[in-house]
Structure formats: structure tokens, C-alpha cells
Amino acid sequence: MLYHASQTGNIRVLEPKVSNHNAPLIYFSAKRENVLVYLSNAVEKYCKETEFAHNGKWHKWASYGFEPDGILRLDEYYPNAIKDTYKGVSGYIYCSNDIYETESDIKINNVVATSEAVPVVSVEFIEDAYAEILKAEKAGLIKIRRFEDMSDKMLAWIKNTIKSEYTQAENEPDYRYFLKAKFPFLSADC
């Protein structure tokens, strides 16, 4: 079984959408817990909650990686990032099988990508993505590296990375708005 997350309900057939890889694709994971991170986008959620006017495509924010053993690790780049991003967010996990993998060069652990429409076999409603993420953490299925547990070296890396991201986001007002709100050091430096 392969899993795909969406905030959109009542999908019978998953259709490819233009992705971060600049091609129409649908991404699936062989691990249900790994798709939980796609139930919310921190940039979009924050901008909507604060009534930031934006007409274009929302910048995708994803601060996760994988442990050497293949377990997904969520990283909090700012205090309470995971709670802010996922608490109160509902969505759906769609299950499919018999997927024809058309993109084999996607370098994300346990991910299968296809450019073809895929029928949905079953669906699970997730009432609160944050609660579900914490449940997966407790079960040892994912790891969370909380902001307050970050090393000084990691905090310095985050600061440098965010400054670079801000500079490169010249044409992404939604992303810059989000970054300035969540990383106060940008206000002093930019």
C-alpha cells in the first residue's frame, strides 16, 4: 500500500500536479507516517491566519530529513514550529496500489512518484495532524528534533540557511513574510 496526503476531501482519482521538481507528479510514500508532514504548509497556514494577501502559488516549507535508519525526522527551526504548523489541521490520507512509477530519480526516502492518474483504494480522515504526528513519534515511527534541543552548531546553520533563503526569495512575498515573522533576527539583518 502507498500513501498520499491532502487537505482536499472526496478524491476518487489522484491527478498529477506541478511539483517542486517542476513536473506534474503525484508523490506517494510506502510509510503512512511519512505523509503526515504534507497535511499542512507552514507558510500558507501562517499567511492565511494573519490575512496576508497572496494570489500566487504558496512557497512549500518542509523542515524534515531522515535518520540513518530511514526514519523521518521533523526539525523545528523556530520555537513551537510543529505545533504552529499542524495543530488543528485536518486532512486525508489516500491509499493506492498498482502505481506505475514514472520518476525514479526522486531522492526522497520511501517515495514513489508518478506522472499518471492513480485511483484511490481507501481514504483515512485525519482530524488533527499535530495529534497524529505526536502519536507517530510516541510509537517510534518518526522523530522530532525540537528547537529547544538544537545544538549551537545547528542553530547557527539554521540562521545562515534562513538568511540565504530570505535573500533568494526576492520574488516570493509570502515566503519572506513568513520568514520575517518566524525568525526575528531577519528584521535586524534585512
Which stretches of residues belong to each language-model region?
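ADP-ribose/NAD+-binding catalytic cleft of ART/PARP-like enzymes
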Residues: 1-23, 38-41
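Surface-exposed, glycine/proline- and aromatic-rich loop segments on solvent-exposed faces
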Residues: 24-28
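Short, conserved phosphate/pyrophosphate- and ester-handling motifs at nucleotide-, phospho-/glycolipid
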Residues: 31
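Conserved NAD+-utilizing ADP-ribose enzyme module
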Residues: 42-190
